[in-house]
Curated annotation (Swiss-Prot):
This is Polyribonucleotide nucleotidyltransferase. The lineage of its organism: Bacteria, Bacillati, Bacillota, Clostridia, Eubacteriales. It holds the Pfam family PNPase. InterPro entries: ExoRNase_PH_dom1, ExoRNase_PH_dom2, ExoRNase_PH_dom2_sf, KH_dom, KH_dom_type_1, KH_dom_type_1_sf, NA-bd_OB-fold, PNPase. It is an enzyme of class 2 (transferase). Mg(2+) binds at residues 485, 491.
Length: 708
């Protein structure tokens, strides 16, 4: 019988079964939390992959719609490629684990997290994070440091570990913390302008719970853990390394002290050519090894400059932001544009406003079924001056787009205030670090230019870190550029407003961050963010008073909910006819609110009138001007409103006897009619003679009033 090991996290049971499933995997296990169950399988190749200069770790997060009792939409009716949310979850699992593998380990490692059952009170991504760490610890793969993961919410001023669905809906913070028992490894957050001190307290609150989960994983590891494989670590031939360093170290060092990037890169390119000329004969098959040595030499020099000389490659102070320029409204036909430049990083963001029917439909394991605001991020090869095929967005592009989207989401106006679907596209035109944060800035500029009444402008900043070997010295860098990102120990991205933080994402290349480092980074990021916001304010201080003349206009009206069927009609016949006649887009909400969107105001007004006519209450005793639509031998049918017809019986057509209806009216005639009855089947009975009589009486009364 399989033994299930369990612990308690936030008052709920976390269970692990290490022997029930995945017998042929290096480690196959089930991990459950409440009714959420995730299958974890971890495997590694027997030998290192040849010809690469990176660690090939692959995290796959597989959502199965049967986990929530759904059948996939579309024609195929099975799961296809991972959803954006699944990709984001996979990236989040990867980040805290990758730095904890041995340096030089180049075996392929794959961890597959398959979501089998979802209880909406217990998030499957958090369960998968803990399961991935534990599976690697139990396996023979050389990974020995458990990582605990929790979600943290903030409700009524109180922190909550792994908030349930009700608490998540009320929470002003959606924070994920991953940590070993000693240090924080990774943080992701979306927040409603949470101040820095509260954000720091939330991270530490989550860290304390992560420690307990990491200790629990250690217990499971002791009981079920396999003997670890001896890793075959990549190492450059010592003689080759000594020769390359001796030949190139001083030249590279001189080059790294050149402040101008173009000039520095030109010198470094010349050094590469000299290296090839020098070592092409003796080490013809070791080009990748030479490149690895050169990379490590550059890294050593840049880190030495920062730690020992307190000097950055581009000459800036540690807390200095690169030069900033902002521009809006430069694409004439776009609904809103923002061009944000920071140093050699440049991002153009374009806003498109659409109807509420343009929302993105989501088909995943969560409760959210549509998205009205979306942000997409493109990173073409030309942004770094390179040549490569242009394909669809990769995981990195999806991740960066989601981060910028998260930073602005709490600032987007509600549907009732601004009834548009909003799509932002950030095009990276030039990249020298921190493009995701430049996307936040560019998006803010574009939204303001488009006339979107966002709550407050937001900006983003990427912070870096370099540490000594023993971690005793820590130097925090503001607004890191490319080299500082490549050779540094941390990428700490913070987005927010002048009031507080709206998004965080940080990960490290070392074994975690100290509490002191996290606190200082948040404080310095705030200072930089306020500086950037002031620069942006100088460009466009507030949103435009109106949306672009090229953007569609939205008109809103409300009808009784029981009249919705009259507007839609059988099989959508009525609403489709209105759309065809007027060229508008129509969205109807369950509460009877109707949104009519059109680039042509006349078309919108026509559609609104038709809907008003369709839904206006017909009152007994009221007189209407109607059009004769059909004649029978017993009377005439008259349309008094769009789609509303009544019968004028032949006896009600005139004061005298009528032998033929055609003697009084013809099809197409406009006549006054009075509603004399609406029967219990909703049929409307009309009278022409009563309408004439009442009209004549009204005219006489008006004449009498004038005489007096």
């Amino acid at each position: 019988m399989n033994e299930v090991i369990q612990t308690t996290v936030a008052g709920r049971t976390l269970k692990v079964d290490c022997e029930k499933v995945g017998m042929l995997s290096n480690c196959g296990m089930l991990i459950s939390y409440g009714d959420t169950v995730v299958l974890i399988n971890a495997n590694a190749s027997d030998k290192p992959r040849e010809g690469i200069d990176f660690f090939p770790l692959s995290i796959e997060y597989e959502e199965r719609l049967y986990s929530v009792g759904k059948i996939p939409g579309g024609f195929i009716k099975r799961e296809g490629k991972p959803s954006e949310k699944a990709i984001l979850n996979a990236r989040a699992i990867d980040r805290p684990l990758r730095p904890l593998f041995p340096k030089g380990y180049r075996n392929d490692v794959q961890v597959v997290c398959t979501v089998l059952s979802v209880d909406q009170d217990n998030l499957p991504n958090i369960v998968a994070m803990n399961g991935a760490s534990l599976a690697l610890c139990i396996s023979s793969i050389p990974f020995i440091t458990p990582v605990g993961s929790v979600a943290v919410g903030l409700v009524d001023g109180n922190f909550i570990i792994n908030p349930n669905l009700e608490d998540r809906e009320k929470s002003t913070l959606n924070l994920t913390v991953c940590a070993t028992k000693e240090r924080v490894m990774m943080v992701e957050a979306g927040a409603c302008e949470v101040p820095e001190d509260i954000m720091y307290d939330a991270i530490i609150f989550g860290f304390e719970e992560c420690k307990k989960i990491a200790l629990f994983q250690e217990e499971v590891m002791k009981k079920y853990g396999k003997k670890k494989d001896e890793p075959d670590l990549y190492k450059v031939n010592e003689d080759l390394e000594e020769e390359v360093r001796g030949f190139a170290f001083d030249m590279i060092k001189d080059a790294m002290y050149i402040v101008d990037r173009d000039e520095r890169n030109k010198v470094l390119k010349d050094i590469d050519e000299k290296l090839e000329e020098q070592f092409s004969e003796d080490y013809a098959d070791n080009k990748s090894d030479i490149a690895d040595v050169v990379y490590r030499v550059k890294k050593e020099i840049v880190r030495g400059m920062l730690l020992k000389e307190h000097r950055r490659v581009d000459g800036r102070e540690f807390d200095e932001v690169r030069p900033i320029s902002c521009e809006v409204g430069f694409l004439p036909r776009a609904h809103g544009t923002g061009l944000f430049t920071r140093g050699l990083t440049q991002v153009m963001t374009v806003v498109t406003l659409g109807s509420l029917g343009d929302v993105q439909i989501l088909d995943g394991v969560g409760l959210e079924d549509s998205k009205r605001y979306m942000h997409h991020y493109n990173f073409p090869s030309y942004s770094t001056g390179e040549v490569r095929p242009l394909r669809g967005p990769g995981r990195r592009e999806i991740g960066h787009g989601a981060l910028a989207e998260k930073a602005l989401e709490p600032l987007i106006p509600m549907e009732e205030q601004f009834p548009y679907t909003i799509r932002l596209v950030s095009e990276v035109l030039s990249s020298n670090g921190s493009t995701s944060q430049a996307s936040i800035c560019g998006s803010t500029l574009a939204l303001l230019d488009a006339g979107v009444p966002i709550k407050r402008p937001a900006a983003g900043i990427a912070m870096g870190l370099v540490t000594s070997e023993d971690l005793s010295q820590e130097e925090i860098l503001t607004d890191i550029q490319g080299l500082e990102d490549f050779f540094g120990d941390m990428d700490f991205k913070v987005g927010g407003t002048e009031k507080g933080i709206t998004a965080i994402q940080f990960d490290t290349k070392i074994h975690g961050l100290s509490n002191k480092c996290i606190k200082e980074t948040l404080e310095k990021a705030r200072t930089a963010r306020l500086y950037i916001l002031e620069k942006m304010k100088q460009c466009i201080p507030e949103h435009r008073a109106e949306v672009s003349k090229y953007a569609p206009k939205t008109y809103i009206m409300s009808i009784p909910p029981d009249k919705i069927r009259d507007v839609i009609g059988s099989g959508g016949k009525v609403i489709n006819k209105i759309i065809a006649e007027t060229g508008v887009k129509i969205d109807i909400k369950e509460d009877g609110k109707i949104f009519v969107m059109s680039e042509d105001s006349e078309g919108a007004k026509k559609a609104l009138k038709i809907i008003d006519d369709l839904t206006r209450e017909i009152l007994v005793g009221e007189i209407y001007l109607g059009k004769v639509t059909k004649i029978t031998n017993f009377g005439a049918f008259v349309e008094i409103h769009k789609g509303k017809e009544g019968l004028v019986h032949i006896s009600k057509l005139d004061f005298t006897r009528v032998n033929k209806v055609e003697d009084i009216v013809s099809v197409g005639d406009e006549i006054l009619v009075k509603v004399i009855e609406i029967d219990n089947q909703g049929r409307i009975n009309l009278s022409r003679k009563d309408a004439i009589k009442d009209s004549e009486k009204k005219e006489q009364n008006e004449k009498d009033v004038q005489k007096k």
